[in-house]
């Protein structure tokens, strides 16, 4: 609850029309990022599930809606990195930093799944499916594993931590529909990594 209070009291403000600042600096930041607003939505859902206190759900929806309204690329349902203030009115969103990273879409995917679980509203599940499909298309690639003698879609090279956070969204979706479409590729990626890159002396990859 202390962390949550800090996020809401100091992370969210009306710069860029809302959203959560992404880090602390000696000088005040102005941009709003997917990597901070998305996790706040997820945390709000989890705090609501733990406490049933409406404030958490209200903020989770507020953060999620901001992500869709300001930071989402509507053409593929994935999320841009951040938005900077409008030059004429800093309380409006301005220029977007349009790089896309896997974790920036994985957190709103997880939030959409959690909001569906909480509210039962189909729009959240529909959005979760759209995000998941685009994540799979962008951050997985066809691969032939000699070690496994299998062809599958492997997690593409990139930042392992980013991909781990993306996978949380796939796991949350799987907990709803039990469809192994994405889980199978994640599992095979991990088994391939273990089979091909495990250090025998310490079992680290």
Language model segments and positions:
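Well-ordered alpha-helical segments within folded domains of soluble proteins
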Residues: 1, 32-48, 97-117, 157-174
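Structural helix-adjacent loops and short alpha-helical linkers that scaffold large soluble proteins
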Residues: 1, 47-62, 74-75, 113-129, ...
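Extended ligand-binding groove/face enriched in aromatic
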Residues: 1-47, 57-58
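Amphipathic alpha-helical segments of tetratricopeptide repeats
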Residues: 8-9, 49, 65-69, 117, ...
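CBM-like carbohydrate-recognition segments
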Residues: 10, 32, 130, 134-205
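Acidic/His metal-coordination segments adjacent to aromatic residues that form catalytic metal sites
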Residues: 22-26, 82-96, 139-152
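Ligand/cofactor pocket segment of small-molecule handling proteins
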Residues: 42, 67-102
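Oxyanion-binding "anion nests"
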Residues: 101-119, 124-140
């Amino acid at each position: 609850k202390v962390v949550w209070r800090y996020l809401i009291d100091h992370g969210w403000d009306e710069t860029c029309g809302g959203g959560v600042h992404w880090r602390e600096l000696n000088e005040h930041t102005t941009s709003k990022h997917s990597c901070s607003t998305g996790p706040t939505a997820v945390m709000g859902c989890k705090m609501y599930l733990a406490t049933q206190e409406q404030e958490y759900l209200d903020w989770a929806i507020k953060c999620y809606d901001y992500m869709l309204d300001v930071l989402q690329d509507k053409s593929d349902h994935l999320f841009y990195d951040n938005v900077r203030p409008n030059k004429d009115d800093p309380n409006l969103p301005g220029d977007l930093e349009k790089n896309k990273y896997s974790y920036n879409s994985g957190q709103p995917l997880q939030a959409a799944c959690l909001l569906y679980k909480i509210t039962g509203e189909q729009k959240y599940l529909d959005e979760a499916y759209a995000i998941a499909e685009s994540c799979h298309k962008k951050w997985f690639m066809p691969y032939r594993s000699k070690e496994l003698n299998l062809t599958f879609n492997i997690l593409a090279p990139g930042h392992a931590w980013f991909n781990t956070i993306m996978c949380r969204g796939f796991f949350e979706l799987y907990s709803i529909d039990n469809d192994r479409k994405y889980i199978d590729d994640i599992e095979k990626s991990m088994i391939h990594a273990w089979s091909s890159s495990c250090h025998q002396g310490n079992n680290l990859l």
